């Protein structure tokens, strides 16, 4: 997927993301799972309901 920025809890700021993938939680909510470009921690960005 394309590169985007999202909030990193460890860095405490918006950081670029890499290795992003769309996932669906058990409650049918969709999110983008990615990693922080600086500290490599896993982070999620909620993108809405799955239907």
UniProtKB/Swiss-Prot annotation:
Sperm. It comes from the Eukaryota. InterPro entries: DUF5679. GO terms for molecular function: DNA binding; zinc ion binding. The keyword Translocase does not apply. A zinc finger (unnamed) spans 8-39. It is found in: Nucleus. The keyword Zinc applies. Keywords: DNA-binding, Metal-binding, Nucleus, Zinc, Zinc-finger. One of its GO terms (cellular component) is nucleus. This is Epididymal sperm protein E. It comes from Sepia officinalis. The lineage of its organism: Eukaryota, Metazoa, Spiralia, Lophotrochozoa, Mollusca.
